[in-house]
A protein has these predicted regions:
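Short Gly/Pro-enriched turn/cap motifs at secondary-structure boundaries
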Residues: 188-192, 219-221, 265-269
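N-terminal Rossmann-like NAD(P) cofactor-binding subdomain of oxidoreductases
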Residues: 1-190, 209, 280-283, 317-318, ...
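Conserved active-site and cofactor/substrate-binding residues in soluble primary-metabolism enzymes
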Residues: 13, 110, 134-141, 191-199, ...
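C-terminal substrate-binding/catalytic lobe of Rossmann-fold NAD(P)-dependent dehydrogenases
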Residues: 192-260
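Conserved short hydrophobic interaction patches
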Residues: 21, 25, 73, 203, ...
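Alpha-helical scaffold segments in soluble metabolic enzymes
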Residues: 17, 141-145, 199-203, 245, ...
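C-terminal active-site/capping subdomain that shapes the small-molecule cofactor and substrate pocket
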Residues: 229-341
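Short amphipathic beta-strand starts and helix->beta connectors
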Residues: 38-41, 209-219, 272-276
Length: 341
């Protein structure tokens, strides 16, 4: 049985990715899209459109208002919010990280956090889902199993992440112009300044019972898409045990793959809903855990479709497997292993 799905914000990078994925989905039918025209938002019309699910690729501060109105007007529909408006546990924490009051505080705590692999038990039947941030996804997928099993210290975790430029959105900014990005590489919002830190720490506390304070440093790569994150952790066990724990956590996952050998590369994951993880020994009592994903797919639109599938009771992989004709993890890993021998 098919379902009608509407997309708010289809003119942004994430919104366009949603539309592309939905057009290939075997059970979802694209009912309508809204976008913006020369900076003027044109989303109001979507509130009057009947659909079984609504995907909100809107800026934070705006998305919560639409989520609230959709929940009130169409309570049986699934609403997946891809902004940061519903990710944090309190209105106070939202104001701290986003710098303004929440537009729909009554929704806080109602949404299921959409880190699909970690919240699979809560997503079936959910009617309000908060999609994680792209950086948060790259950090949480490796850390949740390791902290939950008490295999690493909860203090002194450093997350060093590099993202393609689409992670900054389509807003016209001088620092995102080609001549500013090309042949350059820069860090921004270092330490505890990036708003994704708040959701990372909140989810780690909720899913693992541990209070973690991350040092997080994001960087902007001169590429279109992809995130490569290096997590520097202090293990309580050897690296082989860390790897086994991650393999056990994701052995039945369609999209999260623990790989041996060289760390994952952006080319392994761009265009897919995959996240690839590898574990390596470090010096001075540390280990390094790498994760790689596509910020627009597993970090945004693909995970939103995955959450929609779970909420609707559809196969989790609908519309996502080989959606871009990308090689499978086995093919890519085998090819690289052959080239390195």
């Amino acid at each position: 049985m098919s379902a009608r799905v509407g997309v708010f914000g289809a003119t942004g990078y994430t919104g366009r990715e949603l539309v592309r994925l939905l057009r290939r989905h075997p059970r979802a039918r694209l009912a309508f899209t809204t976008g913006s025209d020369k900076g003027h938002l044109a989303h109001e019309a979507g509130l009057g459109e009947a659909a079984d699910a609504y995907l909100l690729a809107l800026p934070h501060g705006i998305a919560a208002t639409y989520a609230s109105r959709l929940r009130e007007g169409r309570p049986d529909a699934v609403v997946v919010d891809l902004s940061g408006d519903l990710r944090l546990p309190t209105a106070e924490s939202y104001k701290h990280w986003y710098g303004h009051d929440h537009k729909a505080p009554h929704l806080i705590g109602q949404a299921v956090f959409g880190l699909s692999e970690a919240y699979r038990d809560r997503l079936p039947g959910a009617r309000l889902v908060s999609n994680p941030g792209c950086y948060a996804t790259s950090v949480l997928l490796p850390l949740v199993p390791l902290l939950r099993e008490d295999l690493i210290e909860e203090t002194d975790i450093v997350a060093d992440a590099k993202s393609g430029a689409t992670g900054a959105g389509r807003t016209l900014r001088e620092d995102l112009l080609f001549c500013e990005l090309a042949e350059d590489f820069s860090a921004y919002a270092p330490g505890r300044k990036h708003r994704h830190v708040g959701e990372m720490e909140a989810v780690l506390a909720e899913r693992t019972g541990r209070r973690v304070e991350l040092t997080f440093c994001p960087h902007l790569l001169p590429v279109k898409r992809g995130i490569l994150t290096a997590l520097y952790v202090r293990p309580k066990v050897d690296v082989a045990a860390l790897r086994r724990a991650l393999e056990g956590a994701y052995e039945e996952s369609a999209f999260v793959h623990v790989v041996d050998g060289a760390p994952p590369r952006l080319s392994d994951v761009v265009g897919t809903n995959d996240c690839r993880i590898s574990v390596h020994a470090g010096a001075t009592g540390r280990a390094v855990v790498f994760s790689a994903l596509d910020n627009l797919v597993k970090g945004a639109a693909g995970q939103a479709i995955q959450n929609l599938n779970l909420a609707m009771g559809w196969p989790e992989t609908d519309g996502l497997v080989s959606a871009f004709g990308a090689p499978s993890p086995v093919e890519t890993a085998a090819g690289r292993a052959g080239g390195n021998s």
